[in-house]
Amino acid sequence: MASRGGGQHQRHQQQQQQPGGYGRGGGGGRGRGRDGAPYSGGRGRGQDGSYPGGRGGGYGGGGGGGGPPYYGGGGGGGGGGGGQGRGYYDDGGDGRGYQRGMEGGGGRGGYRGDGDGGYGRGGGGYHGDGERGYGRGGGGGGGGGGGYRGDDEGRSSYGRARGGGGGGGGYHGDGEAGYGRGRGGRDYDGGRGGGGRRGGRGGGGSSYHQQPPPDLPQAPEPRLAAQYAREIDIAALRAQFKGLTTTTPGAASSQFPARPGFGAAGEECLVKVNHFFVGLKNDNFHHYDVAIAPDPVLKGLFRTIISKLVTERRHTDFGGRLPVYDGRANLYTAGELPFRSRELEVELSGSRKFKVAIRHVAPVSLQDLRMVMAGCPAGIPSQALQLLDIVLRDMVLAERNDMGYVAFGRSYFSPGLGSRELDKGIFAWKGFYQSCRVTQQGLSLNIDMSSTAFIEPGRVLNFVEKAIGRRITNAITVGYFLNNYGNELMRTLKGVKVEVTHRGNLRKKYRIAGFTEQSADVQTFTSSDGIKTVKEYFNKKYNLKLAFGYLPCLQVGSKERPNYLPMELCNIVPGQRYKNRLSPTQVSNLINITNDRPCDRESSIRQTVSSNQYNSTERADEFGIEVDSYPTTLKARVLKAPMLKYHDSGRVRVCTPEDGAWNMKDKKVVNGATIKSWACVNLCEGLDNRVVEAFCLQLVRTSKITGLDFANVSLPILKADPHNVKTDLPMRYQEACSWSRDNKIDLLLVVMTDDKNNASLYGDVKRICETEIGVLSQCCRAKQVYKERNVQYCANVALKINAKAGGRNSVFLNVEASLPVVSKSPTIIFGADVTHPGSFDESTPSIASVVASADWPEVTKYNSVVRMQASRKEIIQDLDSIVRELLNAFKRDSKMEPKQLIFYRDGVSEGQFQQVVESEIPEIEKAWKSLYAGKPRITFIVVQKRHHTRLFPNNYNDPRGMDGTGNVRPGTVVDTVICHPREFDFFLCSQAGIKGTSRPSHYHVLRDDNNFTADQLQSVTNNLCYLYTSCTRSVSIPPPVYYAHKLAFRARFYLTQVPVAGGDPGAAKFQWVLPEIKEEVKKSMFFC
């Protein structure tokens, strides 16, 4: 039940305003239970003196009640003995107050107030100082308590004081009346709204922007964004650009849907975002083309040449201008150079001379940038954003060279920011990412912390010893070295730059191409004075006696012109990123390093902005750029979790997730699958079959309790060799089938080791079961099998098995409310993803996977299609036939034809949006029209996880503004300030935090024939995240996207190379093949 303060809030929410004041809020409940609803006060029933208080109960009992701090209704202290409440803070009133008060009725009051009326319905905000505290008010009063140290005089104190009482401001406010029923007071968003921190109804006042929480370092007023906002007339800009088209050559105006409005559903809250406003005071920019001859061989030489040129010629040829350079062919200046075209000469050390030709191309137009910022249709202002990114890059690299930053794309790393070994000579360097973006508030600099793997610099032999895990001695022969370590070492070292140490200051650099097949003692080559061994050459020419001549040399030349260097004379050049796939151990260590708590990550980001000193650099002055030193603070909303329905035979039939999580206790799945016959294969060499059998019995019991029709164990546990799984597993399967009554089994349970490096074994098991045998499989980890009565793990396994076998775990209690628009008309929901091989693998194919819902209106079951396509091609090939297959499957399974289509597309960058619209959406339309009459109603949404926007709670001291991990609460959505000025996009953090800082997903609508409102699409997207079958938690992206990603990852295990006949004699040719998934498996959700 809402409190009286809550009623006030509801009226203001309809006006899209935040509740006013601290508000009066409801009192606590009488028994046990939970806190009241946020914002609306509510008569919640706390337990054991939780944050808001309860009304009674025994000593230490009753607690809770009221809403949370900020906006929620108040509530007295926790239950005390009888009527004397024992509360959370101190000095509350007697009875319902916080701690045992002094006199009067106390109760539902403010935040440690002691003004007229005290905690109770009287005055006193935070450290108020009115005369007559604690009681119920009344009397002549005196000076009322201030708000957060507010001290102006007014008519009514913070509480409900009926006497005179001085007024108090809100957060440092100074309005006429306080947070009580008085009128003034600068409160959280003004108005007479509902309760805040357990005060009265609250008077009006200014918005929250003017009263940031007092416990955080705040930006000085006015903020940089506010300064620029006052100087920019958006209406005038729109009028100016009306009818204009984009000025970017070859770019079309944005064809993506405009935002249909802003969302309003959910509880409002404040969040901080790692976006820093960028002010631009200059608009006279010019683009120059750069050509260097002879062409520098090394990539880093380009910047060295231009840097020296600028240093030498800035105040002569460049007329005092300080240009910025992209590292290849583009130079930008703030103002024109004194020439249109000129050729200049640069000489580097070693008498290396280069000619640099500079030619004026054109002024850099900012019109597209201004049009987008004004919310007008325009192309992506790519050139303007590129210019700003280059300026900001040079601010870091050129003016903070004391940090020794190494740049990769938009990320900058330095061991000075932190370095930790991952394993085997591979280190993680900490760094940061920065990128300039166009948002609703204007230009924004997105800064985030980042880490990546580097090869440890120093002696090659030291690295080799770490990599192989042993000391190098003369007991190691060249044959032993190459046979046992050669391939693994060369995967790591190939392409790595080394410098020689035997030539004094001349540290010439080379790239490793391979190892020699012979040791330095015997490896020969032809020199100017005949054939020599490497050992002889270095001994004679450099008077060096090799200590490790028994090891192979590094080959740093080509096949035509080999060049051999002893490993002991080479050092690995610092600052080289490790380019190969990390081992499972290295991945695990990297994850642990990067899993910073939200408060720590935010602190690191702010420290990065401070130490980079953007506004103090020469280039900031030159180009007229200002960067705010404080992160953006904005209003977000927390969407409610949907109510989930379970089977009526369970003790708990309806579940409301809390903080994005719930459990299966006393619940049964909505539709339990039937497992008639199954077998278990033990792939662990040291695991006794009796232990496995005990686990299987527990799994059967738990599955039955969960609602599955699961046959008892009837087959013996089968043992198989993990080193020969390709042969053993099919044999064990046939053996199990021969014992089964129907000569087939429905499920193969496979127990595997916990070795972090068993990914290949897992992949082999899935490939064999799904593309060769044709049986559903469920892998279980040995460490979980060892545990006795591991009910929770068995329950999770049962949920996966149920979904794979055709069951349904849960559904929405109210489908119409949970899936607006979708529930009105038969709808098919797609998820699609394309995964690519490793960064430096150019031959392995990419995998495209598409899943689509098979039921309506529940939307819990999915069909799937997976295809192989050309390496690194992001656009899905042959999407027409894929969609057609899934449309037919929907009709087969649901017995109805779809009327509308929602397509969630993962893995697409902003630069590929137009390509997707032009290539993939027409394929979807083509598939639809081949089956149904009329044009399809398509809503196409790109889902992005690989971005660097992070949301942080505004106040880490307020547990109501975050989940248990310190992250924003699940359901937090943002569609203002940092989002696109015109187009339909939003950030949604649908998942609860587990470890580290949660990453919100970014959704960008590229087409919307179904005319979703912002609230409808955000609600559908958030609610779908509660229907992921493999766990009882909300996930970070909608299930169809999640399944598509898992399926694409799974299919990579299927890929095989087969020889191709023909071609040159003796030349082995291979082609990649993606085996077909067996039909018995394909018709299920085997990818769960």
From Swiss-Prot:
Give residue ranges for domain Piwi: 747-1056
The GO biological-process annotations, alphabetized, read as: regulatory ncRNA-mediated gene silencing
Molecular function (Gene Ontology), one example: RNA binding
Pro residues bias locations = 211-220
What are the GO cellular component annotations?
A: cytoplasm; nucleus
Under SMART domains, the record lists: DUF1785 (SM01163), PAZ (SM00949), Piwi (SM00950)
Q: Name one Pfam family in it.
A: ArgoL1
Q: Which UniProt keywords apply?
A: RNA-mediated gene silencing
Biased amino acid composition, Gly residues? 20-30, 51-86, 95-127, 135-148, 161-182, 191-206
Q: What sequence ranges are listed for the domain PAZ?
A: 477-574
Q: Locate the region Disordered.
A: 1-220
Q: Which PANTHER family match?
A: EUKARYOTIC TRANSLATION INITIATION FACTOR 2C
Q: Give the function comment from the record.
A: Probably involved in the RNA silencing pathway. May bind to short RNAs such as microRNAs (miRNAs) or short interfering RNAs (siRNAs), and represses the translation of mRNAs which are complementary to them.
Q: Which family does it belong to?
A: Belongs to the argonaute family. Ago subfamily.
What's the protein name? Protein argonaute 18
Q: Which organism is it from?
A: Oryza sativa subsp. japonica (Rice)
Supply the source organism's classification.
Answer: Eukaryota, Viridiplantae, Streptophyta, Embryophyta, Tracheophyta
